């Protein structure tokens, strides 16, 4: 689920530091058993995305390359995607704090290209934090995501909600994004733990604005209710890609209609709730398919949409089909706002937890609260 949000004060990272592999082949084979077992499509001119086949598993736990993985030598990474290595005093402070409190952030776990800019505050000095709760190991194996996976991850840390709130309070941020791995192993999908974290933050710092980037909770709308009524300000859940590519890009337990159902329910469950989603580009989608997805999202009242370039974490992940130009991203922003989205963040390095537009979203939250109060 993880991988692509807006936030005010911003630091996104993931604590575990990967050890360098002994060799390229051993790294590829041991990367992630769940992900290696994900769909491996037969070579053909047409792919049946509704009935993917399961790849064979090597004796060492690795998986073979599928027809949608590997590097495409004809698709070169453009200059506009090249980033400097993260550094800076603020970056070091945030990293140390997260390690000390045993907290995870999606910035490091998902290899986000914006980690340096977010943690240091960018040109406007606004730092954005994106904390990842429920551990650092996902029960799903989406083929675009760098977060590690397991069928039976460790149980959630009961101290995580309080530690997260203490960390955020000490940083002095006023807009925080909380995301999580998928936890299909938990009865409520982790929604109760998620809600505890939000409440702990609001108790320590009532004025802080909280955005939650959630899983689909297996379509459990009661779990959605639990989180929506926890005190959060923005409910975010990513559809990730267009309808046709869902079974190729995402874990089979995820789905386009299921994600729409979650977003729709969050919107109607609480008056004034702001909803948000994200779409990756460069996976082989057509312009018409993107427009259809945008129309579906507007039909259920989604307020905020982000577009970003899909970047392949390793050769075992989905191949980049296209590097979309900054000009095309600008087009999608203009088009999205013309059809009614209240805000669209669109750019090659934009991610669902990216720090773009935090001031705008903060103002939007305040306006929505006032409108809801006036109606009631």
UniProtKB/Swiss-Prot annotation:
Keyword Transit peptide: yes
Binding site for [4Fe-4S] cluster 1: 107, 112, 118, 353
GO molecular function, one term: lipoate synthase activity
Signal peptide: none
Catalytic reaction(s) noted: [[Fe-S] cluster scaffold protein carrying a second [4Fe-4S](2+) cluster] + N(6)-octanoyl-L-lysyl-[protein] + 2 oxidized [2Fe-2S]-[ferredoxin] + 2 S-adenosyl-L-methionine + 4 H(+) = [[Fe-S] cluster scaffold protein] + N(6)-[(R)-dihydrolipoyl]-L-lysyl-[protein] + 4 Fe(3+) + 2 hydrogen sulfide + 2 5'-deoxyadenosine + 2 L-methionine + 2 reduced [2Fe-2S]-[ferredoxin]
Protein name from the UniProt record: Lipoyl synthase 1, chloroplastic
Region span, Disordered: 1-25, 47-75
HAMAP family linked: Lipoyl_synth, Lipoyl_synth_plantC
InterPro entries in the record: Aldolase_TIM, Elp3/MiaA/NifB-like_rSAM, LIAS_N, Lipoyl_synth, Lipoyl_synth_chlpt, rSAM
Chief location: plastid
Pfam families per UniProt: LIAS_N (PF16881), Radical_SAM (PF04055)
